[in-house]
């Protein structure tokens, strides 16, 4: 109990984004369309990733950020809460969608990322 009382809380202020990942043989050229091999979604965002990493290492973590009132926002909150992150200070934005990161991953593991920050801003 004493150790828990003395434990410092790490506060992370940052982004929560849903990562939308498509695997492709290579990155497309401007104006080009490629066929990808498969598509995946992952909870992400620099802030959320840091919060989860710290929580997994045993720290008490509080996340401050903003997501939309949408499926991606619900998924992100559930994901970080699963790892023990306190989301009491993550706001839900009625008018703006949750941020997304569009990620292309090529056959060599190199990525390109375009972020639409949405509610993070």
Language model region names:
Residues 2-66, 71-82:
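Glycine-rich phosphate/adenosyl-contacting loop at the front of the ribokinase-like
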Residues 79-95:
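A glycine-rich helix N-cap at a beta->alpha junction
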Residues 88, 92-93, 103-121:
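Conserved phosphate-binding/catalytic loop of the ribokinase/pfkB sugar-kinase fold
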Residues 50, 90, 99-101:
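Short, charged beta->alpha transition segments
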Residues 40-47, 94-96, 120-121:
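Short C-terminal domain-edge/linker segments immediately following a structured domain
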Residues 66, 100, 105:
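Glycine-rich nucleotide/cofactor/substrate-binding loop typically near the N-terminus or early
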